[in-house]
Amino acid sequence: SSDEKLARARALGADHLINYRTTPAWGATVQDITGHRGADIILELGGPGTLSQSFEAVRVGGHIALIGVLTGFEGHVPTHLLMSKQARLQGLVVGHRRQQQDYVNALNLQASRPVIDKVFDFAALPDAFRYLQSGAHFGKICVEW
């Protein structure tokens, strides 16, 4: 959502970067980058406000993991693209403790590490929420207590 975030993603090893704010039709850009094959996997954080572009960007038989709903909880699902691309849309939420431990163990097997943007003390919880709502973060916002 900003050139600064794109620069940080590039520093982490990203090959292709698209600012969805300056390129609202980013699904077509993904198609161009991939030679009109589409992306294998899309991590969809925006929710209904960006979901249609995720369907434009995903390849036939691809996977869209809905892991965030920054633009709201309800909205239009482009069923014609879901069906014609035979794509899979999966909603994901943080599960119970065992699932989280399994997830952390799987992450530990990978070379990449989660990016922690900022850590707040529990007493500053309102500040953490304001920071989240600002959209200025790149990576995770953590609260210690």
What positions do the PLM features span?
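Adenosine-nucleotide cofactor-binding segment
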Residues: 1-53
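C-terminal capping/lid region of NAD(P)-dependent oxidoreductase domains
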Residues: 36, 111-115, 127-145
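Structural motif
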Residues: 16, 40-41, 62-63, 140-141
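CheY-like receiver
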Residues: 29, 33, 57, 106, ...
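Glycine-rich phosphate-binding loop and adjacent beta-alpha segment
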Residues: 3, 9, 45-115, 119-122, ...
